[in-house]
Amino acid sequence: MSNIAISIQDKNGKLLATDNGNYRVNLVYAAKYKKGDTITLTAKPGSFLVIQLDDVLEPSFVYMKGANYTMTIPFGEDRLAYNPKTFSGDVHLLKARLAEQCEIESRKNLAFNSHDTASAKDVCFPHVFANNETVGMSVFAARNAIDGNTENRSHCNWPYESWDINSDPNAELTLEFGRAVKMDKLVLIPRADFPHDNYWQQVTVTFIAPDGTERI
C-alpha cells in the first residue's frame, strides 16, 4: 500500500483521476472541474504532509489524523472566498508529499492551512470552526481566518474574505491542531474595515491540552 494518494471523483462518485506514491504524488487532471466534483487526499493516519491541491493555493503543512480528507470543489457563492483563478481552467496539477523531519520540527505558523474546509473536521489539521458565521456566506466563514491571506482593509469577496461574527457577543472561534503542539507566539490580525469594524473590544484566548486542561 502506498503512503499517499490523490483522487478526483464526480458528483456520482465516479473516479475521474487518481495517482499514488510512497513519498510524493503529482496528479495532473486535464479537464474542467464540474459542480459536485471532489478531491480526496488519502494518507496513513499520523502522517505529516505538505499539500497543494491547486496551483493557486499556497502549499500547506498538514497533519492527517484520519485516512481520507475529501474537499468539494467550490462553485457559485462558495467560490467567492477564493482567488478567482483557483480550481479554474482545463488542466490542474495536484501535489502532496510526506513532510521532512526538519519541516515537522521547525518553527512555523501552526495555524496556516489554505486547504481547510468543514469536511476536514477530525481528519486534516489545522482545522478551524466557529459558533457564528454571518449569514452562512463563504466570504465570512471561519476557514478564512487561517487561509494565509492577511489583507484586512475591506470585507466580502477575495481578497477580503474574513471570519465575521455578526456582532455576536458570544462568538467563538476554535482552532484545532489534532495533536499536542508547542507555541511561543500568538498573532491575531483583526479586520480593519472602519467604521464597519468597530465591534471588537476584547478577546479571550483559551488553550486546551489533550488531557482537557485549560489555560486562559
Annotate each PLM feature:
Residues 181-195:
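A short beta-strand element within beta-rich, extracytoplasmic domains
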Residues 155, 167-170, 193-216:
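Trp- and acidic/polar-enriched beta-sheet ligand-binding modules for extracellular glycan
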Residues 171-173, 179-184, 201:
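Core residues of folded domains in eukaryotic genome-function proteins
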Residues 1-48, 53-176, 197:
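Disordered, acidic Ser/Thr/Pro-rich linker "stalks" and the adjacent N-terminal cap
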Residues 176, 187, 204-206:
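Beta-strand cores of modular interaction/reader domains in eukaryotic scaffold and signaling proteins
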